[in-house]
Amino acid sequence: MADSESKIYHERQRLQFCLLHCLNNLFQDKDAFTKESLNSIAEKLETNDPNKETWTPLSFVLKPHHNTITGNYDVNVMITALEGKGKSVVWHDKRIGASSIDLDDADTLMGIVLNVPVKRYGGLWRSRHWVVVRKINGVWYNLDSDLVVPQLFRDDDEVRGFLDQNLSLDVIGLIWNLPYNANQLPLASNYRVVITHWSDLNGMFSHVTNYPLDFDVYPQVSSKVSAIYKATGTKRFNANTRPVTPGKQSSVKGPYYKNPGCTTSCGLRLPRKTECTAARLIKDLSCKFVMGLRLVVMRKKKKKRSPPLKKASSSGISQPSVISVVNDNNHRSAAIEDCIQFINSSSSFTRSNSTCGSKS
């Protein structure tokens, strides 16, 4: 078993290139995809996007489908890359569970991709991460790039347990070796599946028109795929909702009570596209600067208004209250004496006037 594990190709995590590692681990080939090839796919998706966004200073780094420095490729890049290899992606409905996945169908099912939530730096950093599970030489392995070595599953039940454990928060895609045939669709009530491989959609579900299903089908067109999964980051699709479309955010909350359209990435929380404008960025920075300036001014005013500190006595205990009381008593006694003198002087003045009048 150790010899078989040593022959398994497994790439380790580097920056935010988890999708690159995921695809190479899936194909068991270090040259299956490169950083340059994925960047080229992301740039083509941006070029063919009919709903291009306005240019911002952050556009040099934060591209619509990837980050030029750290990677952070989104789901559009994954779908396009797999379709270029003749594979198709089908999103699995978490309400059905992993029991509906035929893990023994080695001729059709190539692997399973998950987009899982991860916590880093003691839970201070929450992000998303691409993980791939594949069957190699009759044994299922977890080829997560965060693992030191591939994790072996003892049997299919353990694989399904792993998938069911993550289904509540994860986005799971089934990677098929061949174009997905409509005759192979697992018919189940209220099943919602996203298919991104076929270009002929008119007669695809003609034989199941009377079946009470809810299918969302999307064609194999890069621009439309880009329009469907229009968001930056690794996770832009929630199993509870439809894919996020341009200009329309879903009101259903995703993992960690975030909107499924938010730009959560595999290692970085980026601002939403609606927030990623130069005017909004300058406005936010100016507001923060003004708030900080006001805080500094208020503190300086408080320092000027505050009385000087009283010196401590020889015993080491300050007596501000005693000093203030003594000063107040002195002022009061002086005022009382002035009043008494004034009354005495006024009374003596009236008396002198009365005596002078009697003499006259």
From Swiss-Prot:
Q: Which residues form the Josephin domain?
A: 5-192
Its source organism is Arabidopsis thaliana
Write down the top EC class of this protein.
hydrolase
* Superkingdom classification of source: Eukaryota
Where does the record place a coiled coil? none
- GO MF annotations, alphabetized: cysteine-type deubiquitinase activity; nucleotide binding
Q: What is its EC number?
A: 3.4.19.12
Catalyzed reaction equations:
Thiol-dependent hydrolysis of ester, thioester, amide, peptide and isopeptide bonds formed by the C-terminal Gly of ubiquitin (a 76-residue protein attached to proteins as an intracellular targeting signal)
Name the job this protein performs.
May act as a deubiquitinating enzyme.
What name does UniProt use for this protein? Josephin-like protein
Q: Which key words tag this protein in UniProt? A: Hydrolase, Nucleotide-binding, Protease, Ubl conjugation pathway
- Locate the active site: C18 (nucleophile), H129 (proton acceptor)
Mention one GO biological process in which this protein takes part, according to its record. Answer: proteolysis
InterPro entries assigned: JOSD1/2, Josephin
